[in-house]
């Protein structure tokens, strides 16, 4: 389980493309701190009871295929610690709307080129199932105390 501290959008897409709705947020929102620092500090403290806390930069790919070894290498070269197919568009929209954001990524497999084993969706599901109870308990505790960070 890794707390996301920043992201890199490698999709060539952005959920804010199109007409801006000013009532939701500015045309060009600041993305300096998408992932709330106070929330991450709280998560770090609470995680001590559940798992070793780690933070990382998440690179967003479109999917639905797993990334190639070259894509993973490129992401690593430009500063990414994790790769995946989710999270970033929701974080962008939330930040645009003035919502404080925190995000966690469950690392379910070693990306292509890191391991000699072929990637398997079944393995991803299996690891997610094994970790789900720990993550649920952590999130209950985190959400129960989040008002302390606001």
Feature names for model-found ranges:
Residues 1-118, 122-150:
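Glycine-rich phosphate- or other oxyanion-binding loops that anchor nucleotides, phosphorylated ligands
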């Amino acid at each position: 389980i890794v707390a996301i501290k920043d992201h890199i959008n490698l999709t060539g897409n952005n959920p804010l493309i199109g007409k801006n709705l000013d009532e939701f947020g500015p045309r060009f929102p600041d993305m300096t701190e998408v992932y709330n620092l106070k929330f991450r500090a709280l998560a770090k403290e609470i995680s001590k009871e559940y798992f070793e806390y780690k933070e990382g930069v998440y690179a967003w790919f479109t999917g639905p295929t797993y990334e190639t070894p070259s894509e993973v290498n490129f992401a690593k070269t430009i500063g990414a610690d994790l790769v995946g197919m989710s999270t970033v568009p929701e974080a962008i929209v939330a930040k645009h709307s003035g919502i404080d954001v925190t995000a966690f990524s469950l690392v379910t497999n070693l990306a292509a080129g890191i391991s000699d084993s072929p990637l398997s969706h079944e393995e991803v599901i299996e690891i997610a199932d094994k970790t789900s109870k720990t993550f649920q308990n952590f999130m209950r505790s985190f959400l129960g105390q989040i008002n302390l960070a606001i």
